[in-house]
From Swiss-Prot:
It comes from Salmonella typhi. It is found in: Cell inner membrane. It is a multi-pass membrane protein. The keyword Transmembrane applies. The chain crosses the membrane at residues 6-26, 31-51, 61-81, 85-105. Disulfide bonds: none annotated. It holds the Pfam family UPF0060. Keywords: Cell inner membrane, Cell membrane, Membrane, Transmembrane, Transmembrane helix. This is UPF0060 membrane protein YnfA. Its main location: membrane. GO terms for cellular component: plasma membrane. InterPro entries: UPF0060. Belongs to the UPF0060 family.
Length: 108
């Protein structure tokens, strides 16, 4: 379970970075060269999703829970926004959903 969660976390970071760098280019006028590491990050994101031993749709559904938490961590650390009780509550619910799906992988 821990290995799966850590893999999802790294996967989420790759997806967020791969989307954040073009956002910097479009919204903040960063160099177009940031699109190269963005593309590499998104390619790594896709590859990491293939490392799970479940059907793709089930992996994407479970990954979503960790993505929500990682995005909120990004919101706090990178964007400097203080998390609310609603953020924390949503993250907890998302992680519970991920846990239920992952535990069920071996039972279907």
């Amino acid at each position: 379970m821990l290995k799966t969660t850590l893999l999802f976390f790294v996967t989420a970071l790759c997806e967020i970075i791969g989307c954040f760098l073009p956002w910097l280019w479009i919204k903040r006028g960063a160099s177009v060269w940031w699109l190269l590491p963005a593309a590499a990050s998104l390619a790594l994101f896709v590859w990491l999703l293939t490392l799970h031993p479940a059907a793709s749709g089930r992996v994407y559904a479970a990954y979503g829970g960790v993505y929500v938490c990682t995005a909120l961590l990004w919101l706090r650390v990178v964007d400097g926004v203080r998390l609310t009780v609603y953020d924390w509550s949503g993250a907890l619910i998302a992680l519970c959903g991920m846990l239920i799906i992952v535990v069920g992988w071996g039972r279907t």
